[in-house]
Amino acid sequence: MIDRKTLCEKFLSQTPYVDWQRGLLAGDASNRRYERLTGPDGRTVVLMDAPPEKGEDVRPFVRIADYLRTQGLSAPEILAQDAVHGFLLLEDLGDDLFSRVIQREPALEKELYEAATDVLVALHQAPMPKLEPYGPRLMAEMSGLALSKYRTGILGHCDPGLQSRFEDHFEDILRDTVKGDPVLVQRDYHAENLLWLPDRTGVARVGLLDFQDARAGHPAFDLMSLLQDARRDVPAGIEMQMISHYIAAANIDESGFRTAYSVLSVQRNMRILGVFARLSIDYGKPHYVTLIPRVWDHFIRGLDHSALAPVADLLRDSLPAPSPENLDKLRP
């Protein structure tokens, strides 16, 4: 079998970027690798290396990127591709992740979050491409990761019956509360996947990354992902302002949107509890454990909504809090 280094060199040899200087970029929780290629004139592009043999597929990224760009949004332009072997050359949108810009210039925080909220308003008014639904059953099963991975990692034993009961009840809640016309949800819309592009105008000032897992879902999902960030504390005032800003700009039913926001908060944050536990236990990435207390706080806050009453006590009783002792049990 030809190794990936050889495959990559063959891919680059068929592009104008073959002789450009290469440097590794920080990766993410996936199996993808990224490099920045720098030309003799200082121009740069980004190489994505997504091994198909590790379950990666660049085709959804290409399809969604092209769609987002047709809507006037700043997804990277695809400069060259080899979908069979999992290589892409992308427009380089720079290094100014929202998280870095806010750390450097805290006064910009509200402006950046408002711009990211406006992206969602614009996207949710656009005609939607064909996407698989992010429906109640799938969402309930993904939430179950908190029981199968987070709970089991701490307690040392699983309870399939408990998980099955929860998923059945939660599916009913999702079906009753997460309703309406679906929109494209990127599913990982947060400050480390957004880039600030101040030289552009309007919604194009927000560079978009990591949208390849997009599905058809509820408009509240990406807004909640943005404002209940697993990696940084978003001020409560900004969260409340952006929810109100979205509701007013999108001209939608406020009560139903806020209910869906809370239910989806529990859904997503339960999934993240399980994913972070799995990344530590199964993949030797213990740094994700340090993020769990923040995710737990989002989850517990969401449980206070009356719509979650059918599962709230079950979850409070069965999911152990992330005490220092419990977190240590999740580390390899």
Summary of predicted features, one role per range:
Residues 1-18:
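Juxta-kinase regulatory segment immediately upstream of eukaryotic protein kinase catalytic domains
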Residues 258-260:
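Hydrophobic, secondary-structure "cap" segments at the distal end of domains
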